[in-house]
Amino acid sequence: MTKLAQWLWALALLGSTWAALTMGALGLELPSSCREVLWPLPAYLLVSAGCYALGTVGYRVATFHDCEDAARELQSQIQEARADLTRRGLRF
């Protein structure tokens, strides 16, 4: 099972549980305070997931390491490729 399928299954399970609880399909009579928390729950979860994603990206950008050796190696490979292409008749 792919990761997308796992996420879709989890989303379908959570969504159907939320819908069943809020619409009263299970026959459970939830107190009013629970229903007031349950209705906006998907929006809260979406905002929480967005904050987590933004924090994760920010942390990864802040702790990104420069790879100076790899950059030098890549630059030398580019120079070799340019020299080879120039030798074969390509003009830059």
Curated annotation (Swiss-Prot):
Residue ranges of the TM segments: 8-28, 37-57
Function summary: Stabilizer subunit of the dolichol-phosphate mannose (DPM) synthase complex; tethers catalytic subunit DPM1 to the endoplasmic reticulum.
Subunit structure as annotated in this protein's UniProt entry: Component of the dolichol-phosphate mannose (DPM) synthase complex composed of DPM1, DPM2 and DPM3; within the complex, associates with DPM1 via its C-terminal domain and with DPM2 via its N-terminal portion. This interaction stabilizes DPM1 protein.
Alphabetical GO biological process terms: dolichol metabolic process; GPI anchor biosynthetic process; protein glycosylation; regulation of protein stability
Keywords, alphabetical: Endoplasmic reticulum, Membrane, Transmembrane, Transmembrane helix
Family: Belongs to the DPM3 family.
Any coiled-coil regions, as ranges: none
Primary residence: endoplasmic reticulum
Name of the featured protein: Dolichol-phosphate mannosyltransferase subunit 3
Lineage top rank: taxon: Eukaryota
Location relative to the cell: Endoplasmic reticulum membrane
Stored InterPro entries: DPM3
PANTHER family reported in the protein's UniProt record: DOLICHOL-PHOSPHATE MANNOSYLTRANSFERASE SUBUNIT 3
Pathway(s): Protein modification; protein glycosylation
One GO cellular component term noted in the UniProt record for this chain: dolichol-phosphate-mannose synthase complex
Gene Ontology terms, MF aspect: enzyme activator activity
Membrane topology classification: Multi-pass membrane protein
